[in-house]
Amino acid sequence: MSDNLKIGLQYLTPKHALTRLAGKLASAKMGWLTTAVIKWFIKQYNVNMDEAKNPDPEAYSTFNNFFVRELEDGARPINEDGSVISHPADACVSQFGPIMDGKLVQAKGHVYSAQELLGGDETLAAEFMGGEFATLYLSPSDYHRVHMPCDATLRKMIYVPGDLFSVNPLTAENVPNLFARNERVVCIFDTEFGPMAQILVGATIVGSIETTWAETVTPPTGPAVKTWHYPLSGDDMICFKKGEEMGRFKLGSTVINLFAPNSIKFDDSMENGIPTRMGTPFAHIVK
């Protein structure tokens, strides 16, 4: 099948309906059939079950339970240096670099707007103008829980409705504004080095996006942007330590981080296309 045909089918496919169906099937308890699908998936995508807290495929009552499986203790050591920002997920680096003229690189020759990514919030987008961004793609074989790259306090969460194009190199190179048009959950944190955004982007077959404080954010999908504000003082603050879980994908997609200007420097190990492991050095705080 040609690339043009694959992209054309992306536009024609009823992606939301397909994703709702996939979500229902993935959360259904179907006994031996669930186990058979899990075993096929492990073999097909070479999933390393040795690092799972429960490596037995038959222990998972639904496919979703398997997909968001916990890792055994110590499987992802967190870099303890306070000046180091750690990778939030097991993934592959898609793109990273400066936010120039309010634009992020989607793929070679393709850019999109930070303001659109953040749900159209011009004031919020201004906090990241001239800063840095990184886009991390989670493949089917990856661990699909997302963790905090640094100590932080949650300020705001924004649900941005949108499409559900598949996310992969082909769509990144051929679907304009891919990450700013797909459904997403934008999480804004305050840190010792300034504001940070951690954005969970949906895709076809991504049954749900969850956070540890709000649980399932989507589905259901909605027609309008929704915003939640959180206290920045008092007993009700939502604070995280580096390495703590903050969200997960039930079938999953992409994490995008935004950093304020002059706040971080990416680690020398960062390159487009390299695999990442949660907890390893991602960037360094600029003192």
Curated annotation (Swiss-Prot):
<keyword id="KW-1003">Cell membrane</keyword>
<comment type="subunit">
    <text>Heterodimer of a large membrane-associated beta subunit and a small pyruvoyl-containing alpha subunit.</text>
</comment>
<dbReference type="InterPro" id="IPR033177">
    <property type="entry name" value="PSD-B"/>
</dbReference>
<comment type="function">
    <text>Catalyzes the formation of phosphatidylethanolamine (PtdEtn) from phosphatidylserine (PtdSer).</text>
</comment>
<keyword id="KW-0670">Pyruvate</keyword>
<dbReference type="GO" id="GO:0004609">
    <property type="term" value="F:phosphatidylserine decarboxylase activity"/>
</dbReference>
<keyword id="KW-0594">Phospholipid biosynthesis</keyword>
<dbReference type="GO" id="GO:0006646">
    <property type="term" value="P:phosphatidylethanolamine biosynthetic process"/>
</dbReference>
<dbReference type="Pfam" id="PF02666">
    <property type="entry name" value="PS_Dcarbxylase"/>
</dbReference>
<keyword id="KW-0444">Lipid biosynthesis</keyword>
<keyword id="KW-0210">Decarboxylase</keyword>
<keyword id="KW-1208">Phospholipid metabolism</keyword>
<keyword id="KW-0472">Membrane</keyword>
<feature type="modified residue" description="Pyruvic acid (Ser); by autocatalysis">
    <location>
        <position position="253"/>
    </location>
</feature>
<keyword id="KW-0456">Lyase</keyword>
<feature type="active site" description="Charge relay system; for autoendoproteolytic cleavage activity">
    <location>
        <position position="253"/>
    </location>
</feature>
<dbReference type="GO" id="GO:0005886">
    <property type="term" value="C:plasma membrane"/>
</dbReference>
<protein>
    <recommendedName>
        <fullName>Phosphatidylserine decarboxylase proenzyme</fullName>
        <ecNumber>4.1.1.65</ecNumber>
    </recommendedName>
</protein>
<feature type="site" description="Cleavage (non-hydrolytic); by autocatalysis">
    <location>
        <begin position="252"/>
        <end position="253"/>
    </location>
</feature>
<comment type="pathway">
    <text>Phospholipid metabolism; phosphatidylethanolamine biosynthesis; phosphatidylethanolamine from CDP-diacylglycerol: step 2/2.</text>
</comment>
<keyword id="KW-0865">Zymogen</keyword>
<feature type="active site" description="Charge relay system; for autoendoproteolytic cleavage activity">
    <location>
        <position position="147"/>
    </location>
</feature>
<dbReference type="InterPro" id="IPR033178">
    <property type="entry name" value="PSD_type1_pro"/>
</dbReference>
<dbReference type="InterPro" id="IPR003817">
    <property type="entry name" value="PS_Dcarbxylase"/>
</dbReference>
<feature type="active site" description="Charge relay system; for autoendoproteolytic cleavage activity">
    <location>
        <position position="90"/>
    </location>
</feature>
<comment type="similarity">
    <text>Belongs to the phosphatidylserine decarboxylase family. PSD-B subfamily. Prokaryotic type I sub-subfamily.</text>
</comment>
<keyword id="KW-0443">Lipid metabolism</keyword>
<feature type="active site" description="Schiff-base intermediate with substrate; via pyruvic acid; for decarboxylase activity">
    <location>
        <position position="253"/>
    </location>
</feature>
